[in-house]
Amino acid sequence: MILQAALFLAGLTVVSGSICCPPKQFNSYQYVTFVNSTTTIRALYYIVYDGDNQRYLITGDRNNKQLVGTTKVIYDYKKRIAYSIDAKARTCSKFPVQGQFEDQENVCVPGGAEILGPLFYGYNQSRLNSQSYAYNTTSLDGSHHNVVTTVSEDDCVPIVICTITTGGPGGNSLYTVGYNDFYPGIKDITVFDIPPYCNA
């Protein structure tokens, strides 16, 4: 299930240049919902995003003591390869990544995005000022995506991203990602270590 939802946006391409981007390295929870005519997927993932090294990690089987569980997928765009790792079973599969790193996970608001206006979460002095944008993309398979993203106004931290896809496999679809507990920087860089059994 991690792979299904995480691969959905892996082939998107956007206009070069950006209006804004979040910090180059961050950790966050992602609540993902994907719906099309045949499938509904809801999942809570944890993402570790390393823009400095063009890689990110997604895991879905955490517990309260561990942010990264025993299964994870590491997308390494410098090496042009991804690893699906199950540390408990000591298994690993590799597959090529598609597209460019800058286009993955839709974390940057691309140049040319239409401003939909300010939004406010909370109230009074504790409110979070945010900005909402809309833009269109086309993936490598030719499907079209209308993306609406809401980010914090001061530092472009993603809050929610909603993507409507037309012409894709399985028909039209809706993909939403809500971000929670966003933390700039990387708490533990060793989460990107590739175990020896991946290279066997």
UniProtKB/Swiss-Prot annotation:
It comes from the Eukaryota. It comes from Haliotis asinina. It is found in: Secreted. GO terms for cellular component: extracellular region; lysosome. Keywords: Glycoprotein, Secreted, Signal. Residues 1-17 form the signal peptide. Glycans are attached at N36, N124, N136. The keyword Signal applies. Pfam families: Ependymin. Coiled coil: none annotated. Belongs to the ependymin family. InterPro entries: Ependymin (IPR001299). The gene is Sometsuke. Its main location: secreted. GO terms for biological process: cell-matrix adhesion. Component of the acid-soluble and acid-insoluble organic matrix of prismatic shell layers (at protein level). Expressed discontinuously in the anterior zone of the outer fold of the mantle where its expression correlates with shell pigmentation. This is Ependymin-related protein 1. One of its GO terms (molecular function) is calcium ion binding.
